[in-house]
Amino acid sequence: MTTVSMRDMLQAGVHFGHQTRYWNPKMKPFIFGARNGVHIINLEHTVPMFNEALAFISNIASKKGKVLFVGTKRAASEAIKEAAVSCDQFYVDHRWLGGMLTNWKTVRQSIKRLKDLESQSIDGTFDKLTKKEALMRTRELEKLEKSLGGIKNMAGLPDVIFVIGADHEHIAIKEANNLGIPVVAVVDTNSSPDGINYIIPGNDDAMRSIRLYTESVATAAKAGRNQDLAVQAEQDGFVEAE
């Protein structure tokens, strides 16, 4: 099972929160104290809470569940995409479009348009168009790919969303709440833990911290998926003795 140690978290700077004047009082139970005007997060809480979240994600993946990685702020977007791709899951790394979950029917139409344009760009359709029309379609394709590229093969709503930056992604969290989709999220000292099923109190700005979260979640998802494949192989290879 994928687990993260106290040492891993200390080295990644997970314990460094925001300046004390920006704190959210709802995070008080997870704060150890303050140093030089910066809140220090109590890793005695974070370590078991993160490991519990990893076990949950691994379990979802072991049942062929879909994990949606969400992180659209600059510090998180690259790591979010890399981690999701590495474990064959899904991501939103550019901008959360309102209704991405709650208005899935409409989003599905946009994904269909994206796939149609992708086909046209490959099969030579673009070459038969006027320069202006080809340019317009290329721009539309790029725009759709940026917004929906990470979910174009998701084929339905996710079974869990994993969020870096609860404050920044509050719309995604609210949509998941409305649909009863579990939320796993990194919550810094300036954010609210409301609406989050698996809270990970921690630094949501430092690259090393973000990489620790994303890579650990990707590893947990892969472990769960491999467990599912192993069970499948065992079932397929099982022959009843006569």
Curated annotation (Swiss-Prot):
Family: Belongs to the universal ribosomal protein uS2 family.
Keyword Ribosomal protein: yes
Species this protein is from: Shewanella piezotolerans (strain WP3 / JCM 13877)
GO cellular component terms listed in the entry, alphabetical order: cytosolic small ribosomal subunit
Any one biological process term the GO annotation gives: translation
UniProt key word Ribonucleoprotein: yes
Xref: PANTHER family: 30S RIBOSOMAL PROTEIN S2 PROKARYOTIC AND ORGANELLAR, SMALL RIBOSOMAL SUBUNIT PROTEIN US2M
Molecular-function GO terms, alphabetical: structural constituent of ribosome
The protein's name: Small ribosomal subunit protein uS2
HAMAP family assigned to the protein according to its UniProt record, in alphabetical order: Ribosomal_uS2_B
Higher taxonomy: Bacteria, Pseudomonadati, Pseudomonadota, Gammaproteobacteria, Alteromonadales
Keywords annotated in UniProt: Ribonucleoprotein, Ribosomal protein
